[in-house]
Amino acid sequence: MKLHTLVMFTLVIGSPLLPQHRCYRNSQTFQLVHTLNKFVGRRRRALKPTLHANPPSEHLQNLKYVREVTNASIQICNDALKECKGDVEKAIELVRRSAKNSSFVSTSVKVKTEGLVGSQVGGDQVVMLEVLTDSDFVARNEKFVRFVRTLLGAALAGGAAHGGAVTGEGSGATALLSLPYDEQSGGSHSGGPHIAHSTTTVGEQMNYLRNIFREDVRIGRFARYERKNANQFLHCYIHNRVEENIGTSGVLLVLTIDELSEKLKSQGECIAEVANDMALHILSAKPVSVSVSDLPEQVVKREVAIIRESLRGVKKPEGILDSMVNGKMRKFYSSVVLLEQEYMLDDTKRKVSQVIRDFCKKHNLNISVRHFDTFIVGEKNILREGPMGG
């Protein structure tokens, strides 16, 4: 092989190393071969970590998380994580104490997971649950959808038997595993073998699906609300529906309406429409609480402390600083409190509270929002679900 051909081959693929023991015509040729050998050796060492890359470390995942919440530079987020020894919550606070990064860019962050959300009203209660898996292929499988459908029925039956209300991913979701699993109670289903019968539990059926799909199948978040009085209107909304009551995101909503039973007879469609519109807004705007008074006290105190720290270098009288803090807190409330948010389903720039008042005046109703929960597969709200909400 001619020398120039061997040189080009070496530069393109990084192999083989040129032999140095052979005789070349002059010292310049030998020097070229020696330089190429050094270059190829360095290239091989540089490529080796790329070819055998390890999964993203916990530090990189935390770095992505902090940056997504604060939108600060990677260097600032990295320094904050190092200073806080990997504590994500403290790192977010530290970054936001800077005047440039004091505002939340987003209270929702992406989570790498797939699955479905199901929600249904039954009698005096409404339930919403999330079933998670590793791939979209499994999440759209009929057996997986059937499991979510049947689990909804089991959750409603279990809630009717035991009562109470629960929201979260802890004991409430765990309690579902021991419920009886009966596909007949969960609605119709298409054919195919299954092990469901009267003695099967939800946990056993879930293990059965894991063995079939060779993927993790687990119950994520779970919420149940039981009607407290006859004036509470229970509503659920499912977005990107796979079938009725099942989709990729959902909202559980409770409204209080004076003289509900009488109003439903004459204005049932109007009430259902406003409940659906309110659920759509909640899904889009992702509020944390209904009103300012419903916000957790520790969240408010933390926010005030972060804002004051960000204003520490401002040379202003105390009264003006207090006004600046109040102004920033109003902006914070307008992003995380439902009644303070700008209504997203029209361009009138009205607050949600004003939209409700206008609707009540128009239809001679008295409506207030009592409670809501929002589940979006692949997203979590850091003020409700951590780390900031912890």
From Swiss-Prot:
SUPFAM superfamilies: Elongation factor Ts (EF-Ts), dimerisation domain (SSF54713), UBA-like (SSF46934). One of its GO terms (molecular function) is translation elongation factor activity. It is found in: Mitochondrion. The keyword Protein biosynthesis applies. Keywords: Elongation factor, Mitochondrion, Protein biosynthesis. It holds the Pfam family EF_TS. InterPro entries: EF-Ts_dimer_sf, Transl_elong_EFTs/EF1B, Transl_elong_EFTs/EF1B_dimer, UBA-like_sf. The keyword Protein biosynthesis applies. GO terms for biological process: mitochondrial translational elongation. It comes from the Eukaryota. GO terms for cellular component: mitochondrion. Belongs to the EF-Ts family. Associates with the EF-Tu.GDP complex and induces the exchange of GDP to GTP. It remains bound to the aminoacyl-tRNA.EF-Tu.GTP complex up to the GTP hydrolysis stage on the ribosome. This protein may be expected to contain an N-terminal transit peptide but none has been predicted. PANTHER family: ELONGATION FACTOR TS, ELONGATION FACTOR TS, MITOCHONDRIAL. This is Elongation factor Ts, mitochondrial. It comes from Plasmodium vivax (strain Salvador I).
